[in-house]
């Protein structure tokens, strides 16, 4: 799922979805939904209630070496403030259970909004593939009901060195919501 910042970033022909007031994923028609799920990627219209600019601004504060958020401790290998020179990557990544402890209130609210979007996507996928609703909790590790694991990551990839950037990888979640602001995503 990605915000349609610019149609040239991922391709002009990706399906587009929006969220209904009841947090249901809506496509123009069933053919577009089928195509989105076959591709495994689609644009999502940014809900008006989502403060994307505030989140981007917060993400920029992580680039300041004096940012207090650079002192967030690591919880294992995947959480906390992490700066990886070999990947030209600076990030603050936290699971839902740590958001209130480390993120400012407006970023916690942003994370909860993204989490609701992720749940909507998960429910749509589970429904689309024919998994009975009574099995959704088990099939999604609880995520379809708002449980399970959710990360809110602020990641900056430094492109000032001219290096190719991040090595090939896969994300560790079932639903990844990206805010793509510059070309470079390879799917």
Region annotations inferred by a language model:
Residues 1-187:
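Peripheral, non-catalytic segments flanking oxidoreductase cores
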């Amino acid at each position: 799922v990605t915000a349609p910042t610019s149609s040239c970033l991922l391709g002009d022909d990706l399906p587009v979805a929006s969220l209904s007031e009841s947090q249901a994923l809506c496509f123009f028609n069933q053919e577009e939904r089928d195509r989105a799920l076959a591709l495994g990627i689609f644009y999502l219209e940014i809900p008006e209630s989502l403060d994307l600019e505030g989140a981007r601004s917060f993400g920029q504060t992580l680039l300041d070496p004096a940012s207090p958020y650079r002192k967030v401790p690591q919880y294992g290998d995947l959480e906390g403030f992490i700066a990886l020179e070999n990947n030209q990557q600076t990030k603050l990544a936290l699971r839902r259970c740590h958001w209130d402890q480390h993120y400012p209130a407006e970023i916690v609210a942003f994370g909860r909004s993204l989490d609701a979007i992720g749940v909507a996507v998960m429910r749509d996928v589970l429904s689309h593939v024919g998994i009975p609703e009574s099995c959704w909790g088990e099939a999604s590790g609880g995520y379809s009901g708002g449980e399970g694991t959710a990360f809110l990551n602020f990641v900056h990839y430094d492109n000032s060195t001219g290096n190719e950037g991040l090595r090939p990888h896969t994300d560790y979640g079932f639903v990844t919501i990206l805010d793509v602001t510059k070309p470079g995503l390879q799917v």
